[in-house]
Amino acid sequence: VLSPADKTNIKSTWEKIGSHASEYGGEALERTFASFPTTKTYFPHFDLSPGSAQVKAHGKKVAEALTNAVAHLDDLPGALSTLSDLHAYKLRVDPVNFKFLSHCLLVTLASHHPAEFTPAVHASLDKFFSSVSTVLTSKYR
């Protein structure tokens, strides 16, 4: 459960990310594909080379979904219900992949905002990404 302090940290960090969210989403996906090659199997139709327009476009979708989640921290299941259905029933993404992407999102954000990435912010973002992952995999059960 996200505490009031977590919610404050998440919202303030996301405001600082601002217009870079889509860029960071693409970068995090590239990191995920490089670090966890099995994740590529869900994107056989994509050009997965660094800087790929398709990876950037999907990174933008990831960033938009996370921005929506940040705006609805008190109702993540409601905000992410459609995405949960998509990933569980249509795409059938292995739940571990959300953990991989979450890790790569943390690395990406820390590399671009080292001064703001305090232990408290790190912990809050980790809890947020974990909460999002839990919601996205909730319909697998």
UniProtKB/Swiss-Prot annotation:
Q: What GO terms in the biological process aspect are recorded for it?
A: hydrogen peroxide catabolic process
What positions are modified (N6-succinyllysine)? 7, 11, 16, 40
Q: Quote one Gene Ontology molecular function term.
A: oxygen carrier activity
Binding positions for O2? 58
Q: What is this protein called?
A: Hemoglobin subunit alpha
- Keywords tagged on the record: Acetylation, Heme, Iron, Metal-binding, Oxygen transport, Phosphoprotein, Transport
Give every Globin domain span.
1-141
| Positions bearing Phosphotyrosine | 24
Q: Where does tissue-level expression of this protein occur?
A: Red blood cells.
Its biological purpose is as follows:
Involved in oxygen transport from the lung to the various peripheral tissues.
Which InterPro entries does the record associate with it? Globin (IPR000971), Globin-like_sf (IPR009050), Globin/Proto (IPR012292), Hemoglobin_a-typ (IPR002338), Hemoglobin_oxygen_transport (IPR050056), Hemoglobin_pi (IPR002339)
What the record says about family reads: Belongs to the globin family.
The keyword Heme belongs to this UniProt entry's keyword annotation: yes
Record text on subunit structure and interactions: Heterotetramer of two alpha chains and two beta chains.
Phosphoserine found at = 3, 35, 49, 102, 124, 131, 138
Query: At which residues is N6-acetyllysine found?
Result: 16
PTM sites of type Phosphothreonine: 8, 108, 134, 137
Gene Ontology CC entries for this record: blood microparticle; haptoglobin-hemoglobin complex; hemoglobin complex
Q: So where does heme b get bound?
A: 87
What is the species listed in this Swiss-Prot or TrEMBL entry? Nasua nasua
